[in-house]
Amino acid sequence: MKKYLATLVILLVSSFATVSAQTWGNPYSGNVKSASQQQASITFKNKSDYTMTLKIMKEYGGVYSTVVLSPRSSRTVSFSSTSSYKLKIKAVHNGIASYHDGGNFSVTCNEYEWTEGTMEFMLSTYGSGLGPRISAKEFESNY
């Protein structure tokens, strides 16, 4: 009986080790990640003296994530599936806010490819640089 239990334990341990070692991606390109690591990511960088709030909106409405960036800071957001998003930006400096349409972007995340990128934001006192202006009401809307 002890020999049977020891064999069963060894088989169970071996099967768990095999599952955790599975990889995804193209092994010929060198872009191979384990299943537990597979996520797309975008790093948002604020290269200005403004505090920025980024609302990442889902393609058909609803907030995916809200990111607050202090002046000259960055933050990485992870995505677990392929989708399209809309970006809304609120920039605040000396208590004065401006609101902007940051445009649309897409993220790819599947077993063969995934997005890893950077978006940088710069706002100067001489011009926008963040996209067309929108109203505060439009920024607050979740559509």
Segments the model singles out, each with a brief description of its role:
Residues Y4-F16:
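Sec-dependent N-terminal signal peptides
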Residues A21-Y60, S65, K90-Y143:
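Primarily secretory-pathway and cell-envelope proteins
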Residues F44, S80-T82:
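Mature, secreted membrane-active peptide modules
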Residues S65-P71:
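Short beta-strand segments within Ig-like beta-sandwich modules, predominantly Fibronectin type-III
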Residues P71-R72, T82:
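Tight coil/turn sites that cap or link beta-strands
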Residues S73-V77:
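Short strand-edge motifs at loop-to-beta-strand transitions and within beta-strands
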Residues S84-L87:
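A short tyrosine-centered beta-strand micro-motif
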